[in-house]
Amino acid sequence: MNINFFLKKIIIKYLKFFYIFYDLFIRHKIFINKKCYSQAGEDVFILNKFKKPGFYVDVGCHHPLRINNCHLLYKNKWRGINIDLNKISIEIFNFARAEDVNINMAVSLKKGKIKYYYNKLLGLSNSLLKKKYLPHFDIINSDRLDKIIDRTKFKNRRIDFLSIDVEGKDIDVLKSLDFKRYNPRSICVEIWDSKRGFKKHKVYKFLIKKNYLLVAKKRENYIFIKKI
């Protein structure tokens, strides 16, 4: 057996542990309660809309504390699914959100594999787009959002809050969900205003056709509620 190989694995394991400890307890102070964890109060808005704890799905979750729309919900007894391309992000979620289902995958229109570009110097990027300044890549599994949910304990449970932040792939995430089965009660999604205005955006048009009502705008994040 190669002793150096096993020694390297042990070192990497402990380095990851210390990184996660530093990130959660020193850098982001997980033990300190905050009134808001999202970028512009999206989490507070959603929490006030629901009287009882619900079920969330966070696609492009990135970090359990930093600019996260679901951590405040988790602290208020909500539970859900967190999905991200970044392996380290999911390991941090497994520590900080042990009662959630945390998945290292990409969401796409069909099952397959995706080439995922990142920068070794800056850390993993959530972009699926090839950039000259992101020369390194991994191959990651991808699937439809409804198929991913189907493989969890939340199968066929209606989504109370769907949060999407996937750098321009938001419409693909929405199209990969079976709205008849999962039918989210509320959705937070990025819409970058074009010169024509947000009402011309494909995400806005898609959700309006699905019988959603725009109820709030938090910077580039738009919150929609399903009409009764």
Regions found by a protein language model. Name each.
Residues 1-228:
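Phosphate/nucleotide-binding beta-alpha loop and adjacent structural elements of enzyme active sites
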